[in-house]
Amino acid sequence: MNQRNMSIINSTPVRVIAIVGCDGSGKSTLTASLVNELAARMPTEHIYLGQSSGRIGEWISQLPVIGAPFGRYLRSKAAHVHEKPSTPPGNITALVIYLLSCWRAYKFRKMLCKSQQGFLLITDRYPQVEVPGFRFDGPQLAKTTGGNGWIKMLRQRELKLYQWMASYLPVLLIRLGIDEQTAFARKPDHQLAALQEKIAVTPQLTFNGAKILELDGRHPADEILQASLRAIHAALS
């Protein structure tokens, strides 16, 4: 086990059903269906645990005057960090990345509070600390090396955020498998290389030993839903 995934695991799983998988695997469809089915039986809510960089980038792009160029700047810098991790990010880029991780941690803390109140949370995505990079819901700055003291401090603080989040195991994690042809057919606006990378990495993640249900995202949606419901009822009983 390398230093990144050395996190203290909380002994009791939280009342969370996490849905993970490559884009195009059917996460959003399954998440919505599970919330609709389970909300009639128990307090159930959905929460998106991605870092929301795309949505935030869209919001920034809509700001008057500086919005569009600044939005393009942030997207290009984020892409640069992913494609050239050996080059340390600049101070502003590192801060933006760190704040995006703080936003994910804020949503995660909100999820924990809801869970303690008796809600069942259905999450689209789940943070992990085994493989760095927002693409895999891991710490983004951990992909980079070097940099000044400010960047090194942000990198360490971000890593601690992900170690903290990864220490909480969901009661069940549903992983949807998919092949690259199907994923690209469903998400033609995504880069094929990015989909291929997610398809290669996601099945290798252990999520700190969480209970994982493996399902084929190419199967009919209702078949996936019913298999998920059976596993959820077993996990909660």
Curated annotation (Swiss-Prot):
CDD domains, per database record: TMPK
Similarity-based family: To E.coli YghR and YghT.
UniProt key word Transmembrane: no
Organism: Escherichia coli (strain K12)
MF terms in GO: ATP binding
Gene3D superfamilies in the record: P-loop containing nucleotide triphosphate hydrolases
Protein name per its UniProtKB record: Uncharacterized ATP-binding protein YghS
Entry keywords, A to Z: ATP-binding, Nucleotide-binding
